């Protein structure tokens, strides 16, 4: 499997608060089975998903990715949102772009880490038109960030100084066991590790809402998590998986770090994703 691929479309669309958001698309060299929309994680961007785009296009899927506000090549203060609704609005606008390109194809949304939380929240609030969702390493139990004293401080600052920024990065070495991935991430000028206190408090509210409402999920879900994830504890994925009442699959990868799609067993991960997609095209 190759690890790089040239996108066949690059453009922008208008997101929340009028921000210009960058997106791109990759197409298979055959009839499109379905459209896959990628929502990336905190501090990264959609160009970091070459393993995913290559595997999925080779399997016949059209793949779309965008840089969320404050990330990558999109506008916005790094690591800041005014309110969680901004993320919902951005995903809604992004999926509208995907639909313009693939109006008749089944639509799946793949979210990793923060993107997984965003997609879970979106699917719980606006499931219409979604064929299924793939969630990777979601921050249901973020390691170290949600300590009570930090939460208390963040809530105070969020009200009086919402754009106060701090470094919350876990370190590239926690993302993958592959030294090449770690090195590439450390030297990637489009990644960052800065977040504002408002971003943090909004994320905590979203996590609580997903935990509270996950049993209401209406679309099929594939949940992926590395057993040795040092960023978001795998226990969080197990906890939300149990009450889900619809078609659900949980894959936990032994020894896997935070990014299953960029880890040592990424080929197996992508084989699992493709198999699940192929089995859910007509759901």
Where does each model-flagged region fall?
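Alpha/beta-hydrolase-fold enzymes
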Residues: 112-196
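N-terminal cap/lid segment of alpha/beta-hydrolase-fold proteins
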Residues: 1-28
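Conserved alpha/beta-hydrolase
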Residues: 53-77
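Catalytic nucleophile-loop/oxyanion-hole region of alpha/beta-hydrolase
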Residues: 43-45, 72-102
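Short alpha-helix in the alpha/beta-hydrolase fold that links the catalytic acid
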Residues: 219, 233-242
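Short beta-strand/loop motif that positions the catalytic acidic residue
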Residues: 217, 223-225, 229
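Catalytic active-site module of serine/aspartate enzymes centered on a nucleophile-bearing elbow/loop
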Residues: 247, 254-283
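Active-site glycine-rich loops that stabilize anionic/oxyanionic intermediates
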Residues: 41-44, 227
